């Protein structure tokens, strides 16, 4: 797994990872995790698949870069 983009705010944190799947291909995942009222992090991490099945890590990274622009990183 390789974190391509990361951002933290008052609400929580969000990031885009490039992960290797069980088939040895690369997937691009957008993840978010909210802060709890006590300032800690909620255990749940939401995951949205932005792209999957890339044979090349470079192609997955290009997808992550495009997505980062769309998500305002």
Short names for language-model regions:
Residues 1-38:
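Short N-terminal "domain-start" leader segments
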Residues 2-6, 33-35, 41-59:
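A short, exposed loop/beta-hairpin motif centered on an aromatic-Gly-Thr core
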Residues 16, 28, 43-44, 55-57, ...:
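Intrinsically disordered, low-complexity, compositionally biased regions/tails
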Residues 67-73:
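Short arginine-rich
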């Amino acid at each position: 797994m390789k974190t391509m983009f990361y951002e933290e705010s008052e609400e929580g944190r969000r990031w885009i990872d490039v992960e290797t799947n069980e088939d040895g291909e690369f997937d691009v995942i957008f993840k978010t995790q909210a802060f709890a009222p006590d300032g800690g992090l909620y255990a749940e991490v939401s995951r949205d698949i932005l792209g999957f099945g890339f044979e090349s890590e470079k192609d997955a990274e290009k997808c992550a870069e495009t997505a980062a622009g769309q998500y305002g990183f």
